[in-house]
Regions:
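Alpha-helix capping and helix-loop boundary segments enriched in small/acidic/polar residues
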Residues: 26, 79, 83-86, 110-113
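Glycine- (often His-adjacent) and acidic-residue-rich active-site loop
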Residues: 55-94
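Hydrophobic/aromatic residues within transmembrane alpha-helices
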Residues: 16, 53, 66, 121-122
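Short beta-strand/turn micro-motifs composed of small residues
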Residues: 54-55, 110
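Catalytic-core regions built around general acid/base machinery
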Residues: 38, 91, 95-102
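Glycine-rich beta-to-alpha active-site loop
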Residues: 99-124
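Conserved CoA-thioester-binding segment of acyl-CoA-metabolizing enzymes
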Residues: 1-54, 97
Length: 124
């Protein structure tokens, strides 16, 4: 199974690739957590000069949060939003805040569908 996010450092550049092209690179909680950790690493490493984010595939940069999966989880549990769904949105907004205040250049290679949380992780 492919990783849903690919994080690497090449030539002093942090590179984030959202790797869920079959889901238009929609964000999961795992992606949000890994992006948060990677941005912390990049910001605190003087050898890293900037960060680039891109989406895999040809249709989308990022369609936002994977609300289909969150909806299914809520329906499966038969009630109001779960702790995980609330934590997802809380942490995703914190990620947007981190990107907004990031101390190094943050470059989004937007190509294709970009909406909701995709806008947040691309240009906050």
């Amino acid at each position: 199974m492919n990783e849903e996010i690919i994080l690497k450092i090449e030539n002093s550049v942090g590179i984030i690739t959202l790797n869920r092209p079959e889901r238009l690179n929609a964000l999961t909680y795992n992606i949000v957590q890994k992006m948060n950790d990677f941005l912390d690493k990049c910001e605190n490493d003087d050898d890293i000069k900037c960060v680039i984010i891109e989406g895999a595939g040809e249709k989308a940069f990022c369609a936002g949060g994977d609300v289909v999966s969150l909806r299914k989880q809520v329906l499966d549990e038969g009630g109001p939003p779960t702790e995980l769904s609330e934590k997802f949105f809380y942490d995703e907004y914190l990620l947007n805040y981190k990107i907004n205040n990031f101390k190094k250049p943050y470059i989004a290679l937007i190509d294709g569908v970009t909406m909701g949380g995709g806008v947040g992780v691309s240009m906050h």
